[in-house]
Amino acid sequence: MQAEILLTLKLQQRLFADPRRIALLKQIQHTGSISQGAKLAGISYKSAWDAINDMNTLSEEILVERATGGKGGGGAHLTRYGERLIQLYDLLATIQQKAFDTLKDDSLPLDSLLAAISRFSLQTSARNQFFGTLIERDHQQVQQHVNILLSDGKTRLTAAITQQSADRLQLSAGKEVLALIKAPWVKLVTDPALAGAADNALPGTVASIEPGNDHSEVIVTLTGGANLCSTQNNSELHALNLRVGSAVIAQFNADRVIIATLC
């Protein structure tokens, strides 16, 4: 759904940038002239001059440098700061549209900034991406363990992370995090006695099996409702005798969990 979202930036409670002013800056950048830029942007020369004065006055740095007089009203060019403003404005406009598009995804919690940003801007090769809240950090030296409660409110994960990384991510109880787990790192077992062989052992039910030549993809619905993907060697999968509806335990160690968050 393409929405018309008009981005307006204000500084000191005064208009700094809007679609018309950004269009003017782009035309000045293209033509090297305020008068030609104004004409192509569909505004008068006086309005263009006033807009540039306003932006240059409000901004911490000059956006447009100009030379008065001369043919066509004098030359002008954007400073590096002005060029970056255009880039930032276009970036914000893209983010606004992508954010609006998340309205169509009813499964996405819009009360989570991390979940929203990750969904429309973050692409990773990890098949398993779980949103959750950090509930505990052990503060050991060098390597630490953190416990994460997933957004289903039931499933808990343990992740291993270096002390330096935990400090850099500013991990503390209550912080929203994204846990990434690659599918080959997830092993499946059916014997509950083997559940203690890994740091994380999540019970669930086989939802689907996609066979391949050497490996197969197994989707497991966890007891909390989240889906987890595992790729299994076909010989191992055959030994487990899995089928849709089979009860399984998904296992992976804490050092196989990658943590991402907003700082």
Swiss-Prot record:
It is found in: Cytoplasm. Its main location: cytoplasm. GO terms for molecular function: cis-regulatory region sequence-specific DNA binding; molybdenum ion binding. SUPFAM superfamilies: MOP-like (SSF50331), Winged helix' DNA-binding domain (SSF46785). Keywords: Activator, Cytoplasm, DNA-binding, Molybdenum, Repeat, Repressor, Transcription, Transcription regulation, Transport. InterPro entries: Mo/tungstate-bd_C_term_dom, ModE, ModE-bd_N, Molybdate_resp_trans_reg, Mop_domain, Transp-assoc_OB_typ1, WH-like_DNA-bd_sf, WH_DNA-bd_sf. Residues 33-79 bind DNA. Pfam families: TOBE. Residues 124-132 are annotated as: Required for dimer formation and molybdate binding. GO terms for biological process: molybdate ion transport; regulation of DNA-templated transcription. Residues 123-190, 195-261 form the Mop domain. Coiled coil: none annotated. One of its GO terms (cellular component) is cytoplasm. Transmembrane segments: none annotated. Residues 1-120 are annotated as: I. The ModE-Mo complex acts as a repressor of the modABC operon, involved in the transport of molybdate. Upon binding molybdate, the conformation of the protein changes, promoting dimerization of ModE-Mo. The protein dimer is then competent to bind a DNA region, upstream of the modABC operon. Also acts as an enhancer of the expression of genes coding for molybdoenzymes, both directly and indirectly. Belongs to the ModE family. Homodimer. This is Transcriptional regulator ModE. The gene is modE.
